[in-house]
């Protein structure tokens, strides 16, 4: 039988082993802490996405407007085409997007594995151009391509293991047991780090530019976000904290991005699933 001291020692050894195995590198060369593998993040994200979409469908919250569906499919399809070129493993992803009927919510996201969602509030509150919408979705897709979902899940797991270790050390089984629930909750609610946001800005503006959209729109998009934030902070900013000097950093990227695709030649459109 394990004693509590032995359990604590085992937990510490296990945590140390996990830490050593958790080293990874992002597409920009940044070191990443990944206790959760990218493939595990894809599997968990798919399950969460299907559950979310099912609930939305039951509540009649999935948009079926042909014009909006075509617009979203066209723009995201071009971004996915570029993603396939720059990140070949993403060719195996089940790319799909749900358009959620919620005029008050200004948000969008992309889970590991290419499972996306966009809220109608983005269009109604921000009056987005195609170029600006491409920047938002390029940013979101970049979070998935750069394994930011796995990073958030890893942070949640580290918190969970820490809580369980404290519970074991203090002979408090209830603390150890509830650690798992805390970890699962954090995986869903933790915002991206500001470092991850800067990385998604960098990768996202490149994706959108290569797809044929104006890189200047990255700047005008965040100006609109800033104006809206003065009235009421959009949900987008609660999970996407703004890095310091975001607009200035994006401004510096515009000229080199224009050199990549000076004629804004449109990328081919990869067919993706619009969830209905």
Model-assigned labels for residue ranges:
Residues 2, 7-11, 23-276:
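A Zn2+-metalloprotease active-site environment signal
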């Amino acid at each position: 039988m394990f004693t509590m001291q032995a359990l604590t020692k085992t937990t510490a050894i296990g945590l140390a082993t996990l830490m050593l195995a958790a080293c990874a590198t992002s597409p920009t060369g940044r070191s990443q802490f990944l206790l959760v593998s990218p493939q595990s993040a894809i599997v968990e994200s798919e399950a969460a996405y299907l559950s979310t979409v099912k609930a939305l469908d039951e509540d009649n919250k999935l948009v079926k407007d042909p014009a909006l569906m075509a617009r979203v499919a066209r723009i995201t399809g071009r971004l996915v085409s570029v993603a396939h070129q720059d990140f070949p493993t993403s060719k195996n992803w089940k790319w799909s997007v749900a358009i959620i009927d919620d005029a008050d919510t200004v948000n969008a996201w992309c889970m590991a594995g290419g499972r996306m969602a966009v809220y109608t509030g983005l269009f109604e509150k921000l009056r987005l151009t195609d170029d600006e919408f491409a920047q938002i979705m390029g940013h979101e897709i970049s979070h998935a391509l750069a394994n930011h979902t796995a990073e958030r899940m890893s942070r949640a797991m580290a918190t969970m293991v820490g809580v369980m270790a404290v519970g074991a050390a203090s002979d408090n089984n209830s603390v150890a047991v509830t650690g798992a629930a805390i970890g699962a909750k954090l995986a869903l609610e933790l915002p991206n780090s500001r470092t991850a946001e800067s990385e998604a800005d960098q990768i996202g503006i490149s994706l959108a530019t290569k797809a044929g959209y104006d890189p200047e729109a990255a700047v005008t998009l965040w100006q609109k976000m800033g104006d809206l934030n003065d009235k009421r902070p959009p949900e987008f900013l609660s999970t996407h904290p703004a890095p310091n000097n975001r607009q200035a950093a994006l401004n510096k990227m515009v000229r080199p991005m224009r050199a990549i695709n000076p004629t804004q030649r449109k990328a081919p459109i990869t067919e993706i699933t619009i969830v209905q």
